[in-house]
């Protein structure tokens, strides 16, 4: 009976290092490439979402895990494009999304998947018809390669995006319904684990 407290203390102290191996939160920051049709400018007579555009920028995410695998992600991005060929000279897109995440640790790497809901705010420097704030959802995943116990490299994160884009009716006063647009986002960067 006198050895029971010592045995309990020994088992707890052996368990603590194992708990330290599971990180409860991750912060990601890196590069973002987005390909999406940003909208139909006022110089286009179209009933669709306009030409697809490549945008470069940044991505940041914070993920908190409830256990070893299941967590919640908040992701923010900013993507930018400038073109003299289109009716707008620059486009700035900012997304803010939240949703569940699931990670699959495998050796010195972790694959993950997430489903995010949120919004997109788009601004144009010269054409306000492509400026809007809309609902946006995305599903995707990626791979984190551990560089050390607290730092990982994320070489790939791919997200499929879906949003609605307002269409400008240049032929009359009747408003046209918004058009659904599919997009893709690639991100890569560094993950810090806490």
Across the structure, where does each feature detected by a protein language model lie?
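Surface-exposed strand-loop-strand hairpins of Gram-negative outer-membrane beta-barrel proteins
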Residues: 35-59, 132
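Cleavable N-terminal export/targeting peptides
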Residues: 1-23
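Transmembrane beta-strand segments of Gram-negative outer membrane beta-barrel proteins
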Residues: 21-37
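Subset of outer-membrane beta-barrel
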Residues: 146, 150-152, 162-167, 178-181
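Internal, hydrophobic beta-strand segments that form the core of beta-sheet-rich folds
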Residues: 157-158
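Short acidic/His/Gly/Ser-rich catalytic and metal-binding motifs that mark active-site loops
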Residues: 36-39, 83, 122-124, 163-167
